[in-house]
Amino acid sequence: MGGKASLILVMGFAFTLGYISLNMNRLASRSTSNMALYNEITLSHNLAIAGANVGLAMLYQNSSQRGLLTDQTLTSGAFDNGRFVVRIDSINPTTLRMRSISRLTMSSSNVVGDTVEVFVSPQRRQTFTLFAYMSNFQSNSLFWITGDTIWGRTHTNGKLSISGSPVFMGKVTATGGFNKPPGTNPNHAIFKQGWETGTATIGFPNDLSEIVAAANSAGKWYGTDKIWVQLDPGTAANNDGWAYVYNAAGWNSANIIDSVDLSDPMFNGVIASSREVYVKGTLDGKLTVSSTERAMYIEDNVLNEKHPTDPTTDDVLGLVAEKDIVISNNAANNADCEIHGSLFSRKNSLIAENYNTRGICGDLRVVGSIVEDHAGATGTFNPGPPAVLTSGFASRFTYDERLSDNNFRPPFYPGFWAHGLEVVNWWESVRIPEFY
């Protein structure tokens, strides 16, 4: 019995080990097949992504293309036996869909395919408050000089003139370049986020009709009357500010013609006149004040109840003029002037009244955004070196970072249509392989 038992035991072990070996070989074969399948499926997916990137590159060259963009069959390389077809079509007035479809013949002769869809917006309405400073063009006689500092993004459709070492804390873009290349005399500017030339022109609106329409609907429209607007923050509570409107006789309580509750839900946040507008005071609320055909005058500091850098503030102010926005030459403005708001001059500039004859007035501090047709003068300087202020104001422009959100802006503040296409969504099909 002992010999038979030993024989049976040996045969049992041999059968068991043989069965295990057979299964291990089968599993190894399946693993190899599954890996090959996964690799081919991944290639199909990557082929669709490659097609999408080719399509985007073609749109970058010509954003007006519609319909079939490309149909390519590959006969070598990683995507051998692969094909992708890319087309772009309009699916609604504001959205285009670019679709990339791949086809890959696998080693088993089966064909797999994947789809990538990229949704793009051909029109982007953006607000000018995205810029800390912007000008439509720059005068060759007006310079950024040593002592000037801008926090935030800067752009000009023209040529940027620099003398000395002004500091630009955000990226600078200049469609027309610089008066002298950075690093060559007298342009020793400090660009903290770099600079770029030859960028696309950003168009200004043809008029301020949107503000006129808003003022005539649920805002305050004063027609052809000059107005003086004094902002009053009310109490220490939030959102209880007022705007007091005076007639042409000026700052006297007897001349008040309107009291505007800025928290009134029926008020859309716009106060406007086609004539000159004079502004001062402290804002609690959301407001745009505009002179739609003339100039605006800053009579004293124009502040928010809570500083724009306070994370709890929701105050936001727009100061919009067809012509100049003028820092008045008066006692209140002769020792610094501070403005919390977004300033927009459609045809002219932000300037200091009598900038070349008034004394040295310290700093013009703007916390917000400045957009002007052409750069205006707020002071004069001796080019040195070093460049030294001789009259008017030195510029201290700080960007209100809240304005970097395109959806956050003063009521009915001017905007522009951005060029090109913006990717708003990217969708990829995902296949779950059926491994065996």
Annotate each PLM feature:
Residues 2-158, 168, 433-436:
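Beta-strand/loop motifs with alternating small/hydrophobic and polar/acidic residues, enriched
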Residues 53, 179-181, 350-351:
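Short gly/pro/ser/thr-enriched loop/turn and capping motifs at secondary-structure boundaries
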Residues 93, 106-112, 236-238, 313, ...:
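Short, solvent-exposed loop/turn segments that connect beta-strands within catalytic domains
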Residues 97-99, 297, 351:
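General beta-strand recognition
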Residues 99-101, 290, 353:
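Beta-strand residues in well-ordered beta-sheet regions across diverse protein folds
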Residues 125-330, 345, 401-436:
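Primarily marks folded extracellular/lumenal domains of secretory and cell-surface proteins
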Residues 313-389:
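Extended C-terminal subregions enriched in glycine
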Residues 358-436:
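Compact functional segments
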